[in-house]
Amino acid sequence: WADASIAVQPCVLAMDSGGAGITSQGNASVNLTGCSMRSNAAISTGGSGTMSAAGFYAGSSITGSETGGPLFPYDGTISDPYAHYSPVQDALSQLGSSSGPAFNDKPGVTTPLVSGIPKFWSKWDIQGSVVLSPGIYYVNGDISLGDSASLSSLSSAGVTIVMGGVLTMRGGSIISLSAATKAVYLNGAIPGVVFAGNSSNRSSFNGNTGTKLTGVVYYPNGALDFGGTSQGGTTGCLEVIARSIQL
């Protein structure tokens, strides 16, 4: 986490003070161990979903009865913890500097991709299985995963995907990726950050329950739908930062 001054670090942070904040609908089950949930706007739960965390902090109201943990409504706002973190901002600033080719594959085919070859992609349309080597990947446009598609990395390989479009997952698609660590980061991967995007549109991490992400998912301008597997912890955790978040 780039801002160590926050006492109980958020695993889920919605930054827009005038928007939807954090919402939970349907049967979503969110268990944040050792970290908090924070919205600069409201936090609301509905349906049969449950949420538990070390604390719930909101710039306005907290509504719904299915929250397990201390509630802190009208607790003010916090700033973007990565707004001045140069590794992330420098990477985002490179998007659009070169268009690059599009990636398309076929169901049932496994394709390895190597960081920097090419440096920029225009989009990824994944129908089969894509396996990433360690490093950073720039995708100027959208990333889409079709039914039963998968996006993963080599064992112990830390990756960062920097993208300018939206991410969508269909059906039984799976993403299994981990960010690099400060001890081991190769080929430009940003330690701790697995996804960074600058789109103002809505991305959806709503694939198969096998989806597992370790690191920060950073979409400061866009809305994120994070289904089924939303989880976090103190070690090897998932941290989600976006304009607004639906669980």
Residue ranges and their predicted role:
Residues 41, 60-62:
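Short, polar loop motifs at secondary-structure junctions
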Residues 98-102:
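Intrinsically disordered, low-complexity effector regions of RNA-metabolism proteins
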Residues 1-6, 28, 63-97:
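Short, structured interface segments
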Residues 2-48, 103-247:
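Long, polar low-complexity repeats
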